[in-house]
Amino acid sequence: ISFRLAYGGAQERFGGRPDLTVFGKIIGGGLPVGAVGGRAEIMALLDPTAGKARVESGGTFSGNPLTMVAGHAALTKWTRDAVDRLNAMGARLRQRVDAVFAEAGEAGQLAGEGSLFRLMLTRETIRDYRTSVRTAQPMARMTAIHKRLMQEGIIISRIGLGCLSTPMGESELDAFVE
């Protein structure tokens, strides 16, 4: 999540300097990969050449050539302009979907931050994580909307989670809103 919010991650967006920062599959173009970064003295614990006690690190996909090539390709497209464009698209999508629900007199909104969103079928304003989890979703209605979106080629999770990606443009936003 943190990498999507700003080019420099959540720490750029909200300020602060974390001891550790973790990135998920977005850095691999959706393939199974992650990365950990942090202060030098913490990262030194992972250094196998340090000659002192360290933390073992590794994994099934560590250094996997396909994943590394995909990650390199994804990160060459992940520019400051691309992040800003996606986040602006996310804001427009949320505004447009919210307007559709309001005009129809229906309970619903698209909550989220940056290029991430969650369809919430409620009139209660979703301000934070707490309000999102205390709000019960009418699952029959959510299932019907999810099914319709899938029929139109729009993929979100069954609970309404979704995200925008760099190849998307205004036509994808239009399709979602319709």
Question: Where are the regions a protein language model picked out?
Answer:
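Conserved N-terminal phosphate-binding loop of PLP-dependent enzymes in the Aspartate aminotransferase
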Residues: 1-178
